Amino acid sequence: MDTSLHQEVSTRLAEFNFKPEQSGMLRGGVCPACQKKELYTNADHPWVLRCGRLNNCGEVYHIKDLYPDLFDKWSERYPSTPENKNPHAAADAYLQIGRGFDLAKLRGLYTQEYYYDSKLNIGSATVRFSLGSGYWERLIDQPQRFIKKANFKFGMHYHGSWWKPDQIDLQDVKEIWLVEGIFDVIALMHVGIHAVALMSCNNYPEQALSQLQAACGNQHCTLVWALDGDPAGRNFTKKHVDQARAAGWNCAAAQIPQRGKRAIDWNDAYQRDALTPDHIKTYRYHGALLIAPTREEKALLMYL
């Protein structure tokens, strides 16, 4: 966390009434969920606030969710200047600070561009990723002002395909995770999981799978369907698994259990340090429950 952002965050954290810093930690804050003085965070890097009552509360808050206004003016906070001539300064900051990514892993995958809405007469810097014959871009300057927070190139089609990092050769992997968004792919990449982005839950990547199937021959990998945990994502997970199995693919699934009002995706989990091997095991268990074909198989999974 850079100095200016840390100062602003530290000032606002006073609302939780933490005890004075000890050993680099802030403890004894009032948890917004249970109202107990069990909230704690790292004093130097207060990205995540956690309630210590694991059995009775255990709520987790990312600083972006608590103070979103600190994370929605990237061009203003991190501009390209005569001293810093980086044309991707705002995009770099958004990905590194806002998303928690290691930029060294992302070089060449994105550019900083600009989107202007002529009807609203407003614009925003964007983080743009090439996608097939077009692109997908995320608006990063107060995106709530626009009708959509992200755009595809006008007129392009992506259904039947997917997005993947250029450095990954899918013919050499034993598992491919299929997720909804590009940032989900990048988050999983940071923990050694090879993934592709479908760009929407209803996109079955038939063309991409057919091409991979032809390239791999009989050496099929396992497809791990890891869509969002909302009703649409869960329903399409089951539909896609059925379709992929009918095409000869081995399939599994992974699901993040959802709690509270805010949905948690793979990038959120990464920023909350919730993509450890134990976490992944839990997510795969919930995915297996979701796609279990019979009540008996689901009951067996729960029993084991």
Per-region residue spans from a language model:
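TOPRIM fold recognition
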Residues: 1-11, 32, 50-52, 58-60, ...
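Intrinsic-disorder/low-complexity linker and hinge segments
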Residues: 64-86, 168-172, 290-299
